[in-house]
């Protein structure tokens, strides 16, 4: 028997999902607990409900065949109240639970917050007090008294301690204390390109160039690197594994005229099976279990938008998929149909051999959600990276979140992070609502800004500060965005950081994916610029991502050249220095809450040098970034600081930061 319990904080975007809470569009349920946040969110739902009401009218979910959990509610629990920052200078929380005495709220980003302990199964009245004089009800909570005062009403329903019947999949072997995803550093392992631990399963396809073929990486190789301490040495505590789902045999033509295999995992075929060229379910479970022993969480890439046309699911259930023909043309994304606009973006096929699920069909949606739940349970993973989110219907996301809440128990929330490949922040935000959809998405607009201003040295740091100021809190107080500078769909960052950048900030690099491939830089400057970009990435809010190989500045053009096999030997001194810097940055981040959850304030700004202060409680640090090729001197308020990144003590009155370096000062 596995015992899971937690002390949960109910807020607009994080409402104890692990204990069976779901979004509900019907306000005022007696057994519910209202989200306590004045911010309007992009997704559906105004109530959060707990217990047996969860799941009604929410679409099909997997039938696990196990008896219900035995749950015991606690006497009380912590409740997080939130209010969006406006022009006020202070906000207090007042309610009948404390005699209407104001409780001071603290500013976290663009949101005022405070946590109070309330009795379970009680009803409380409350309001927010702005600047000590203006009393306002919670604009997000529709439940208010009708006595003329308009006090907001909260029905407190604390999550229970639940005993789950043992269903057998991959038990956690590591610590069971709740993990805060804001404390994570993600490392993306493209399994086939990372480490070959078992040469007996190597099986490349004939007639396919090496760059687009199976190259031998496998789960055994990942397991070996976990056990060798590579990830803990790098300061990584979350692994994102490329999809382990079975891929098709054979080769298939890409839109560039070259043949490809399904080595990447994005052509799912037998949806319940692990791809044999990387391992089997038992090995996947072992990878997850071993990671947990080292305090590393595991996220699986999950592909829900489409299948390969050789999939038995497609062959047996053709009515679950959109027709390739639409409007008298073949609806292929970027061909006969658009990638970006409804209704075509939800129904277009990525390739003519990748049928697109029609999730307006309830049976299709239910099957897909149940399959995702099965992978979560069988693998023991802690979260999903969800592929191509903008191409699916929102109902799939809400059904998945509901099913996860009801059927998957973890010591921490099951993290859902999406991929919406766009510079449109509004579109990215549309799918984020941690109570009912995604916890966050990968922040492509932030990535483009960091690449442009730091790696490519275009524009100035005024552009970066302007972007960050608008981006802070944009996706909601409960969201946890995935931040990154490199990924598997874009050219490698070291080639963007060359003296003459080899690609643009949004350039796919496809013109140099097969020919005229970028070289591994032989000089230190490109690696140093990557180091400055990592210093920014690892000192800003969100959960930062390291794309495999970026820690050593692995070179590469467009897909598939940006997926070269990981370099495990023969690295240059410049590559080794970059890896050491990244490791130091991750460990400083782990030691300082200000770098993970702090409030940011600009303290110096110039064209090529930028300093900002990060504060969380008593933890206060100053980050200095110098992107230029010359030393930069600035003045700070403090008389002296300890340089956590480079060592030693420096004077704040005249602080010089060498070319292409960063400082983290305490």
Residue ranges and their predicted role:
Residues 13-74, 160-173:
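Ser/Thr-rich, Pro/Gly/Ala-heavy low-complexity intrinsically disordered linkers and tails
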Residues 483-513, 534-535, 541-574:
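Aromatic/acidic polysaccharide-binding cleft in carbohydrate-active enzymes
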Residues 178-184, 194-379, 396-409, 414-418, ...:
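Substrate-binding/active-site clefts of carbohydrate-active enzymes
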Residues 288, 292, 296, 306, ...:
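Active-site-proximal helices and loops of the catalytic beta/alpha 8
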Residues 185, 652-666:
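C-terminal beta-strand-rich structural cap/linker in extracellular carbohydrate-active enzymes
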Residues 624-628:
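Asparagine-centered strand-capping/turn motif at beta-strand->loop junctions
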Residues 91-96, 630-647:
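Beta-strand-rich binding/interaction modules
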Residues 72-125, 129-159:
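Aromatic-rich carbohydrate-binding modules that target alpha-glucans
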């Amino acid at each position: 028997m596995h015992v899971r319990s937690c002390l949960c904080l109910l807020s607009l975007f994080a409402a104890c999902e692990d204990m069976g809470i779901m979004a509900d569009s019907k306000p005022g349920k007696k057994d519910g607990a209202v989200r306590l946040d004045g911010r309007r969110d992009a997704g559906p739902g105004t109530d959060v409900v707990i217990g047996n009401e969860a799941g009604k009218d929410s679409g099909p979910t997997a039938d696990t065949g196990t008896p219900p959990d035995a749950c015991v509610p606690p006497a009380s629990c912590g409740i997080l109240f939130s209010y969006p920052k406006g022009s006020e200078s202070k906000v207090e929380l007042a309610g009948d639970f404390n005699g209407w005495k104001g409780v001071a709220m603290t500013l976290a980003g663009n949101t005022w917050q405070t946590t109070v302990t309330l009795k379970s199964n009680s009803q409380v009245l409350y309001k927010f007090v702005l600047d000590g004089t203006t009393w306002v009800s919670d604009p997000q909570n529709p439940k208010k008294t009708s006595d003329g005062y308009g006090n907001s009403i909260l029905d407190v329903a604390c999550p229970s301690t639940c005993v789950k019947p043992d269903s057998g999949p991959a038990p956690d072997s590591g610590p069971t204390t709740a993990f805060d995803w804001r404390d994570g550093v993600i490392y993306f392992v493209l399994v086939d390109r990372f480490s070959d631990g078992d040469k007996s399963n190597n099986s490349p396809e004939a007639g396919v160039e090496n760059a687009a073929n199976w190259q031998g990486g496998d789960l055994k190789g990942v397991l070996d690197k976990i056990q060798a301490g590579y990830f803990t040495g790098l300061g990584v505590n979350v692994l994102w594994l490329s999809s382990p789902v079975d891929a098709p045999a054979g080769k298939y033509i890409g839109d560039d005229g070259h043949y490809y295999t399904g080595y990447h995992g994005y052509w799912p075929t037998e949806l319940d099976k692990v791809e044999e060229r990387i391992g089997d379910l038992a090995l996947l479970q072992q990878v997850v279990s071993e990671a947990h022993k080292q305090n590393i969480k595991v996220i699986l890439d999950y592909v829900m938008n489409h299948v390969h046309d050789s999939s038995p699911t497609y062959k047996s259930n053709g009515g679950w998929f959109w027709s390739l023909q639409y409007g008298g043309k073949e609806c292929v994304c970027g061909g006969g149909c658009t990638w970006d606009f409804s209704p075509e973006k939800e129904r277009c096929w990525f390739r003519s051999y990748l049928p697109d699920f029609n999730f307006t069909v309830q049976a299709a949606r239910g099957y897909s959600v149940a399959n995702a739940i099965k992978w979560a349970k069988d693998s023991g993973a802690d979260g999903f990276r969800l592929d191509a989110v903008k191409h699916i219907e929102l109902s799939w996301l809400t059904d998945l979140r509901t099913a996860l809440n009801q059927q998957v128990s973890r010591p921490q929330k099951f993290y859902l992070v999406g991929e919406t490949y766009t510079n449109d922040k509004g579109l990215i935000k549309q799918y984020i609502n941690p109570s009912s959809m995604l916890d966050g998405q990968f922040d492509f607009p932030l990535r483009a800004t960091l690449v442009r201003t730091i790696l490519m040295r275009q524009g100035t740091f005024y552009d970066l500060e302007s972007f960050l100021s608008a981006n802070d809190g944009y996706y909601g107080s409960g969201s946890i965005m995935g931040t990154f500078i490199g990924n598997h769909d874009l050219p490698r960052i070291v080639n963007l950081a060359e003296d003459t950048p080899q690609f643009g900030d949004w350039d796919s690099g496809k013109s140099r994916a097969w020919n005229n491939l970028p070289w591994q830089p032989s000089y230190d400057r490109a690696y140093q610029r990557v180091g400055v970009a990592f210093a920014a990435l690892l000192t800003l809010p969100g959960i930062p991502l390291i794309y495999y190989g970026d820690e050593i500045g692995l070179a590469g053009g467009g897909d598939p050249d940006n997926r070269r096999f990981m370099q495990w030997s023969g690295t240059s001194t410049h590559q080794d220095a970059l890896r050491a810097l990244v490791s130091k940055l991750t460990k400083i981040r782990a030691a300082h809450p200000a770098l993970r959850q702090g409030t940011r304030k600009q303290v110096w700004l110039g064209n090529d040098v930028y300093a900002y202060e990060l504060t969380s409680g008593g933890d206060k640090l100053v980050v200095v970034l110098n992107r230029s090729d010359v030393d930069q001197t600035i003045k700070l308020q403090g008389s002296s600081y300890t340089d956590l990144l480079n060592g030693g003590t420096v004077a704040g009155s005249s602080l010089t930061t060498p070319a292409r370096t960063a400082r983290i000062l305490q």
